[in-house]
Amino acid sequence: MEWIAETALAACENATLCLDPFHIVRWATDALDVVRRFVWNLLRRIGLTGQAKRLKGCRYALWKNPDHLSERQAAKLAWIAKHNSSLYRAYLLKEHLRLVFQHRGHEAVAMLDAWLSWARRSQIPAFIQLYHRIKKHRAGIIASVTHGLSNGLTESVNTKLRLLTRIAYGFRSTDNLIALCLLDRGGHCPRLPGRS
């Protein structure tokens, strides 16, 4: 991330670096997955293979937003809350960080600072590492929540262009790929011959 910041600031001296909320929450999801794997390995090591097996099937329930959970996934989360407090705290840390980006201005900054304090005191090594990473990039995160910026639209266009590139595999020239991209993403709507 540092290389892109240096390049952007060299080209645009007055630019404000804003970090994408999706990627910040992805960091928290990765930290949560580290905790999940640690707990899973610990349960297997101490001989609780039944709980370990049940925990292994909970990955997607931990990753998803709470409002998108199925009944079965909600039951898995309830089981985690009852049987494994450290993993559930890691899940709550991830969800509270996600909630920071649903607010704007001073409220979001206050929520981020509260989250940083909680993560620092959590005694969960993966989230303490995440605390240091987010503290390092705090200015970019605050700029993002203050301005309400996201890379979501750019990411979706890039994904669509990669799909069109795969579709265009076998075209004789790159001009045909460019024409396909312009037709699909560029808003160009030529009149077709023989149609009114």
Task: Give, region by region, the residue ranges found by the protein language model.
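Acidic/histidine-rich catalytic cores and adjacent linkers
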Residues: 1-16, 22-29, 45-196
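Short, surface-exposed amphipathic charged segments that create phosphate/polyanion-binding patches used
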Residues: 29-40
